[in-house]
């Protein structure tokens, strides 16, 4: 079985959060597909994860002993066997479609048979505070690079290269944008509203961040101040550094928001400062769960060590998420992402259980 390097998976997963921000008061439902070929080691591995806002609610992995879509959120336990049966069949059909697409794309790019390749897809819809359709999106990627994207008008495509233009012409001839637009404005919105209602206790909560600062000597003359925010939900958060009240954006090292493994998120921002000048620097934290923004300043008497146990536990859980849900995480490393090949085929009717009836063929 082909193994994707952990660092690659971390990048994929963290990328999910970077560009899936919704407009204020809006909600989104997104699906992330990843298919990885492994020549000589069996069928490609197909993984799908679904998110409502920042919460994963379903998962499917073709490598499971008995591949079946599984719930990943409490409210999904309400769905009956018909829901899971139908969506499991959708995913199995998608896995076979992707297997063909991997061969097609390999031909488009004149690649040898021995290499491992990856197809990724992100698609979904977003509703405003009133529950009405706001926008839809679909992005495909091949081997980690943009391939083709459905434009915001949901009527036209942007192809990344000559190979993707072949797919674009096929999809235009088949009027796939029209079919996708109907799905996004109809089925997708209907199921998003249902999940928002059934999962409101989880999805409408706000967990404020637990914050602290750590100090790490770099040399005799410099030290790194790192501002931590842990255990917050939703994922949207702002960490900024100031020196004497002036923003230090250019000098700030900032990591993407990452899952903590327990339904909450983590993030840190760091600056390198002259030793002895730490008091001139402040970290400012803004989050929906805070009554007002927080301001942190390094106190020499405070403990300089990071709560390693908590961080490691989060990373271990993150690893579990990646191994099974991974993926998808795909792209959206700042609006990059999405891509794949071949042409669409309708894998299920518009009343499919979760509205994940977007599948492709080459």
Curated annotation (Swiss-Prot):
GO BP annotations listed: antigen processing and presentation of endogenous peptide antigen via MHC class I via ER pathway, TAP-independent; antigen processing and presentation of endogenous peptide antigen via MHC class Ib; immune response; positive regulation of T cell mediated cytotoxicity
Extracellular membrane side: 25-308
Cell compartments where the protein resides: Membrane
GO molecular-function terms, A-Z: peptide antigen binding; signaling receptor binding
List of glycosylated residues: 110
Chief location of this protein within or outside the cell: membrane
Region (Alpha-2) residue spans: 115-206
Membrane topology label: Single-pass type I membrane protein
Region (Alpha-3), start-end ranges: 207-298
Residues in the signal sequence: 1-24
Disulfide bonds: 125-188, 227-283
Composition bias, Low complexity: 342-362
Record keyword Mitochondrion present: no
PROSITE patterns: IG_LIKE, IG_MHC
Domain called Ig-like C1-type: residue spans: 209-295
Segments forming a coiled coil: none
Subunit structure: Heterodimer of an alpha chain and a beta chain (beta-2-microglobulin).
UniProt function note: Involved in the presentation of foreign antigens to the immune system.
Family per similarity comment: Belongs to the MHC class I family.
Protein name: Class I histocompatibility antigen, Gogo-OKO alpha chain
Species lineage: Eukaryota, Metazoa, Chordata, Craniata, Vertebrata
